[in-house]
């Protein structure tokens, strides 16, 4: 059953740079590794980070939720020997003003299950805080009772594959606009695998794909971009007619708040 590929993302409030309000405005065509996505405007998704191993290999995405914290997917298997790269757009360029941040602690949700991919969320505490700027800032976290109804057009970003059988991932950050899909419609594709800690989006001609995992699904709420989902899993061939599955951040907020308050 080729149903497992995985993705994830998060971010909190900055001092001078408020959460969820990019200094450089994103421009989405709405048509838009993301399969059938498009290049993002550099710096327009300032919470997007790249998780890289010590060789510099990008293996997952993530989201800044504050200067000190990143949210990603548990299935990414992040270790403290990995690094968080913030402020990046073109992974093939060495001209960018990126921040390479060490990870002090990895908090994987203890209820995460690799077989059901439930509770697919990990928080990373940074060893040194990110320096917020016009290209590095946080996404807003939702309230537990926030609702992102079916049909809401949201955005996902990442450096994941643009075709499931592509030999390599794109160098430039990709973006796509995609609608939230109802639980009932999502279950038509995925059945009982879908639970209350998941949300679905896509089936609209675009899809997240391998390498996007851990990155953000963001929706505009009261004028700010809010983290609704973390790229988790989906079609093994990144089908653009099947919804992709994201960790439902509202359902996981009690655990997030518990970790942030205790650390």
From Swiss-Prot:
It is found in: Secreted, Extracellular space. The modification Phosphoserine is found at residue 93. Residues 1-18 form the signal peptide. Its EC number is 3.4.21.1. It catalyses: Preferential cleavage: Tyr-|-Xaa, Trp-|-Xaa, Phe-|-Xaa, Leu-|-Xaa. The keyword Hydrolase applies. GO terms for cellular component: extracellular region. Keywords: Digestion, Disulfide bond, Hydrolase, Phosphoprotein, Protease, Secreted, Serine protease, Signal, Zymogen. InterPro entries: Peptidase_S1_PA (IPR009003), Peptidase_S1_PA_chymotrypsin (IPR043504), Peptidase_S1A (IPR001314), Trypsin_dom (IPR001254), TRYPSIN_HIS (IPR018114), TRYPSIN_SER (IPR033116). SUPFAM superfamilies: Trypsin-like serine proteases. One of its GO terms (biological process) is protein catabolic process. Pfam families: Trypsin. It comes from the Eukaryota. Disulfide bonds join 19-140, 60-76, 154-219, 186-200, 209-238. One of its GO terms (molecular function) is peptidase activity. Residues 34-261 form the Peptidase S1 domain. PANTHER family: CHYMOTRYPSIN-RELATED, CHYMOTRYPSINOGEN B. Belongs to the peptidase S1 family. This is Chymotrypsinogen B. The lineage of its organism: Eukaryota, Metazoa, Chordata, Craniata, Vertebrata.
